[in-house]
Amino acid sequence: MTGIITKGEKRLVVVSGRAHPELAQDVASELGTEVLSSTAYDFANGETYVRFNESVRGCDVFVVQSHGDRVNDWLMEQLIMVDALKRASAKRITVVAPFFPYARQDKKHLGREPISARLVADLYKTAGADRLMSVDLHTSQEQGFFDGPWDHLWAQPVLVDYVRTRVDPGNAAVVSPDAGRIRVAERWANQLGGTPLAFVHKTRDVTRPNESVANRVVGDVEGRSCVLVDDMIDTGGTIAKAVQVLLDSGAKDVIVAATHGVLSGPAVDRLSTCGAREVIVTDTLPIPAGKRFDQLTVLPIAPLLARAIKAVFDDGSVASLFDTVGVAGA
């Protein structure tokens, strides 16, 4: 047998950008470690500087960064972090981007438009990333944009476990805010024990971002507690209008459940006054005090991320984390 055999052990390292350091700390805590010390700041002209304060040579490094407000700044910071790790001889670099930046720009709606999600995936690869990890991509097909493994995690188990404590499945309905996400709603219905399905028919003008018109409900929601599910809440317009349509159609009450709480612009006002009994999101993105309101519940995503990171580090199966959900992992 040729070659050299060493007794060195693999070392798992978690590093964090400045967008949501609390999430990285929670992930590290779940893994029984600490976030690697680093220095990061912006120069007067806006350029970003990053340096890691410990050696990462030969390490399996997971770079955690959220991409909410200032998405371009945080994306650039994460790219610079990956570049620094590559030049410092990290053995493997996994980008952990729970809310993948530019995920909604995954195809061309009109001529002369970019496919920005593909561009971002290419940038990660060029910077030196070996692997990506995200939660609830806008479309699963985006995994094909990256030349390497992309672990697509699902927050559904986290959300469903909580929603079970908030509704009677025997008198509930799972509702998609549009026809395009009916498959997600179907998985929710199965997890809740086969509750009825419905969706809100809506139209959208692709030339006017963040605007849609909710028209009518397709399905039986009268007298039922409706669970309105989506991947994200941005300005809240789609969700607020859907809640109103459901209540006007005779729903007993409405609970909103979404993975990513972007909560841009008028979202807080819209969601707090739309009539929803509760709005549930995870902390894939930081939600400051100014964006919190009485009906909002924020669930931790760190345990799920930590389990996936441990599976990757141990060369295990990430897909097995979702065997009971009926979705394809990585």
Model-derived regions: residue spans:
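PRPP-associated nucleotide enzymes
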Residues: 1-330
